[in-house]
Amino acid sequence: LAVALGADATFVARTMDRDPIHIREILSEGNKHHGTSFIEIYQNCNVFNDGTFSVFTDKATKPITTVNLKEGEPLVFGAENEKGIVLEGTNPRVVDLNSGDYAKDDLWIHDPTDRTKANILSRFFDDPREEMHFPRPFGVFYKEDRFTYEDVLNEQVDKARADLGEGDLDALLRGNNTWEIQE
């Protein structure tokens, strides 16, 4: 996901095959996005990597190893949503909501239009010194409405037609703007 964000992708998300409702929502949202959608899918393979993502899909471990990214909602996780993530500058930190030191109002509120925060989320599990310190995020990391190549191309063609007319291929080929290559 970090590579997709670094390549300036306009829709970046992650989902898993074992959660049919979530995968349907993410694929539908990616399909509706105007532009290219990059969606990482954690998919089990019974032959080559059976159970590789089970820590994120099993009912017993999923609540403590994953966090669902929902626009406008705080990043909470845990068996009873007792943990949350705060952002201090650009440094995320896991906090215990039962300690009394933090409330849900103190937590990081997910904003999928913030590229900087999306980059931070994409690296939650990449620190080898702190294995499973952060939960694995699932959902839409980043989305941006922006023009696409097709938009610009069609605009250019429409402008040329408006300025120069429809054009005539036969007139172009028979006109004086051609040349002959001789040996």
Question: Residues of each region from the PLM?
Answer:
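Glycine-rich ThDP/TPP pyrophosphate-binding loop and its adjacent helix/strand module
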Residues: 1-113
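Conserved acidic/glycine
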Residues: 64-65, 69, 74-183
